[in-house]
Amino acid sequence: MRQAQKAMEPAFDQTTERIDSKPMRIDILTLFPEMCDTVLRESIIGRARERGLVELNCRNIRDYTLDKHNRVDDTPYGGGMGMVMQTQPIYDCFQALCGEVGRKPHFIYLSPQGKVLTQNRVRELAEYENLALLCGHYEGVDERVIEELVDE
């Protein structure tokens, strides 16, 4: 069964080897980093990490809150229904990432309104040396994050 599954997967050597020796760096900004760690060790992503093709890091947005309860949610700026992720912890997490990387990575907010992830889109994203992926929660993120930080 495993051999049949492996035969169906695309070969890394033919389609995804990076030309430069530096691995692509992807940082995931999330409220649930423990979920990321488990998933990123498996399958194609896990093998890419083992081969040094990609460096994946999960950042806990709660680590950047300023209150003792590590609160990340608030009512939407300007009013509205539900709760959204606050600007401050996301901003501080992203600034720490920029300082660590030495530049602003291409920043993508993952949401139902975003682009569909196709093979062609993956090829486009592979051109970036650094990607940061923001995982939303609640009713989404404060609109100021999208306007000020997010590239897509």
Model-inferred region functions:
Residues R2-A4, E9-V101:
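N-terminal nucleotide/polyanion-binding subdomain common to many enzyme families
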Residues Q86-H137, D142-E143:
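S-adenosyl-L-methionine/SAH cofactor-binding core of RNA-modifying enzymes
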Residues I146:
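Glycine-rich beta-alpha loop elements in corrinoid/cobalamin-binding modules
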